[in-house]
Amino acid sequence: MAKDDSTVRCFQGLLIFGHVIVGMCGIALTAECIFFVSDQHSLYPLLEATNNDDIFGAAWIGMFVGICLFCLSVLAIVGIMKSNRKILLAYFIMMFIVYGFEVASCITAATQRDFFTTNLFLKQMLMRYQNNSPPTNDDKWKNSYVTKTWDRLMLQDHCCGVNGPSDWQKYTSAFRVENSDADYPWPRQCCVMDKLQEPLNLDACKLGVPGYYHSQGCYELISGPMDRHAWGVAWFGFAILCWTFWVLLGTMFYWSRIEY
């Protein structure tokens, strides 16, 4: 392929533009995944206690892939400008590996959405909230963080239980074993609080008087952020894969035409 051919120069320009976009997308993907793994809503303990925090694993992979995409796009641009077969061959080998990792990240993130069900968080809450008799130290740690997370959620977001306060009444739970139904029909955090974080009217809260306890469940406040992050990692990653596929295909065609 003659390097002074205007058609070749135009094709080189298109490939360079394509790789610039790939590099920028890599930076954006890394930033998105960093935001996700930083756990802005502090919900990681709830996922870890289910022994399935794969969505965070997908985000860590996405972060690694984003950095690699940026570096490889720079390598590809250098190889295209120099029309160097060896540089581009090294680029292809590494890009295929990175591409495979990103496919795994997208699939993992997309499939995790079906995992975030009400029954999952309900079972976990009933089993671990204020459970002071864990069988192992690992369970003790998980119970402690699950309890702290639920206390914060109910106080901060003005909700109670997964579906509502009735969760504490209808189902057997570690909380019910530790507390009497008369004094603690539901956790104190379900009560409407005053400025000092004390129940506005404890008796009214225990009796379930409207306006003195939170009747809304916390499920939407838990699943919403997780779903958004899962779809963000999955579909933005998928869009990057689609763009990268065509850029990679064009680069392979260019590589095949470079003279030895």
From Swiss-Prot:
PANTHER family: TESTIS-SPECIFIC EXPRESSED PROTEIN 55, UROPLAKIN-1B. Heterodimer with uroplakin-3A (UPK3A) or uroplakin-3B (UPK3B). CDD domains: uroplakin_I_like_LEL. It is found in: Membrane. GO terms for biological process: epithelial cell differentiation; response to bacterium. The chain crosses the membrane at residues 16-36, 60-80, 87-107, 230-250. Component of the asymmetric unit membrane (AUM); a highly specialized biomembrane elaborated by terminally differentiated urothelial cells. May play an important role in normal bladder epithelial physiology, possibly in regulating membrane permeability of superficial umbrella cells or in stabilizing the apical membrane through AUM/cytoskeletal interactions. It comes from the Eukaryota. Keywords: Glycoprotein, Membrane, Transmembrane, Transmembrane helix. This is Uroplakin-1b. Signal peptide: none annotated. Pfam families: Tetraspanin (PF00335). Residues 1-15, 81-86, 251-260 are cytoplasmic. Residues 37-59, 108-229 are extracellular. It comes from Rattus norvegicus. N-glycosylated with high-mannose oligosaccharides. Belongs to the tetraspanin (TM4SF) family. Its main location: membrane. It is a multi-pass membrane protein. GO terms for cellular component: apical plasma membrane; apical plasma membrane urothelial plaque.
